[in-house]
From Swiss-Prot:
Pfam families: EPSP_synthase. This is 3-phosphoshikimate 1-carboxyvinyltransferase. Coiled coil: none annotated. Keywords: Amino-acid biosynthesis, Aromatic amino acid biosynthesis, Cytoplasm, Transferase. Signal peptide: none annotated. It catalyses: 3-phosphoshikimate + phosphoenolpyruvate = 5-O-(1-carboxyvinyl)-3-phosphoshikimate + phosphate. Phosphoenolpyruvate binds at residues 23, 98, 126, 173, 350, 392, 417. InterPro entries: Enolpyruvate_Tfrase_dom (IPR001986), Enolpyruvate_Tfrase_sf (IPR036968), EPSP_synthase (IPR006264), EPSP_synthase_CS (IPR023193), RNA3'P_cycl/enolpyr_Trfase_a/b (IPR013792).
Length: 433
């Protein structure tokens, strides 16, 4: 793939898409399978940069696994307890894979000594203070190597559980990371969440995967308090099927909502554990026609595609797709996306990046501390889109090609983080004739 890709105007949209495995579920399942008693066969594993970083780290930690030729099935033999480095000078490099590095920091804070975890330049910019502080409360000995509150870090073990307080308003990945290692701690763990919990559906994913591996966490209905017994062990479920990625589904469902025709995505459905399936409900509220099945969601264009004012804190990834859909709304009202501060601590500062790139194609955008106010253009303009090495920016701006102008996307290879063949799949449901 070249350093850019130009998508010419797409005239029609129609087809069926088999979704790649969920990134969030894939890396959670890999980590828990690695720490389980017994062997697990993971089916529909996502093959992407993020999962490859996790697999490489597990290999360095002595975990044995076997991948199918297409990397979508992984047979992994658990170590039956906490992960620990076999080498006192181990360094794990995890790129910009937040779903790998944060859970691994937590998992390795129990027993590992003198192990360093680091990432690429963007990952080093993403603060991890709240996770490190939480682990230190439980006895974890963690040292910042280059600058406070950021990667790289060196771990010296020591985490044992107990009473923990964690902020919930920065990233749900911090809470997920701590939750996944609570049963392996020597003490029972009581967690209190301070502030509003962002991206709550991702905590539901964590709890669901933990249940599949034999561990149930108690919590109140508001997700303010969690309790898990220590000195327990994960048990391999023998086989675990990973859902399709609901965030990735958003681009294809949006395409049908914008252009017409019908798109069916397979791999997620009405019983999905992923919060981003709520994206389909939002499309329906905006005027699209949605049909649900046990393992599919189908979208067709409605009479009008309406802008709305909505809190999208629960679906931060799919909400980016809504920002681009705003370009195509026809009810003469702005699209307002609220409660999205955590966009700023993702693979890029997504709030600023999205505002910048939307303006290039003609939208009038107001960027607030935690919101975007988007007025669609009278005529969408052709533009060269910077992706900031952010896979989701690249994928959602592909939707601009559903207008009557082309769009050129810089660094399309960044989609390898979660959806390596995205552009091929996207063009497969389009027709330029």
């Amino acid at each position: 793939m070249e350093n850019f890709i130009t998508l010419n105007p797409i005239k029609k949209i129609n087809g069926t898409i088999y979704l790649p495995g969920s990134k969030s579920i894939s890396n959670r399942a890999l980590l828990l399978a690695a720490q389980s008693v017994g062997a697990t066969r993971l089916i529909n594993l996502l093959d992407s940069d993020d999962t490859r970083y996790m697999l490489a780290a597990l290999l360095q930690l002595g975990v044995k696994y076997k991948l199918s030729t297409d990397h979508k099935i992984c047979e992994i033999k658990g170590v039956g307890g906490s992960l620990q480095s076999k080498n006192t000078q181990t360094t794990l490099f995890l790129g910009n894979a937040g779903t790998a590095i944060r859970p691994l920091i937590a998992a390795l804070s129990i027993k590992s000594h003198n192990i360093v975890l680091t990432g690429d330049m963007r990952m080093k910019e993403r603060p991890i203070f709240h996770l490190v502080d939480t682990l230190r409360q439980g006895g974890g000995r963690i040292e910042y190597i280059e600058r406070d509150h950021h990667l790289p870090v060196k771990l010296y073990g020591g985490y044992c559980g107990g009473n923990i307080v964690i902020k919930g308003d920065i990233s749900s990945q911090f809470l997920s990371a701590v939750l996944m290692m609570t049963p392996l701690a020597s003490k029972n763990t009581y967690i209190e969440v301070i502030g509003s919990l962002v991206s709550k559906p991702y905590i539901d994913i964590t709890l669901s995967v933990m249940r599949a591996f034999g561990i149930c966490v108690q919590h109140d209905k508001d997700y303010k308090f969690f309790y898990c017994e220590g000195n327990r062990i994960y048990k391999a479920p023998q086989e675990y099927v990973i859902e399709g990625d609901a965030s990735s589904a958003s681009y294809f469902l949006a395409a049908a909502a914008i252009k017409g025709g019908t798109i069916r995505v397979l791999g997620v459905g009405k019983n999905s554990k992923q919060g981003d399936i709520k994206f389909a409900n939002i499309l329906e509220r905006m005027g699209s026609i949605i049909t649900w099945g046990d393992n599919y969601i189908e979208c067709s264009k409605g009479i009008m595609l309406k802008s709305i004012d909505i809190d999208v804190n629960d679906i931060p990834d799919a909400a980016m797709t809504l920002a681009v859909i705003a370009l195509f709304t026809t009810n003469n009202l702005p699209m307002i996306l609220r409660n999205i501060y955590n966009w700023r601590v993702k693979e890029s500062d997504r709030l600023h990046a999205m505002a910048t790139e939307l303006r290039k194609v003609g939208a009038i955008v107001s960027e607030g501390y935690d919101y975007l106010h988007i007025v669609p253009p009278v005529q969408i303009q052709s533009a060269f889109i910077n992706t900031y090495n952010d896979h989701r920016i690249a994928m959602c701006f592909a939707l601009v090609a559903l207008s009557n102008v082309s769009v050129t996307i810089n660094n399309p290879k960044c989609v390898c983080k979660t959806f390596p063949d995205f552009f091929d799949r996207f063009l497969s449901v389009g027709n330029n004739l």
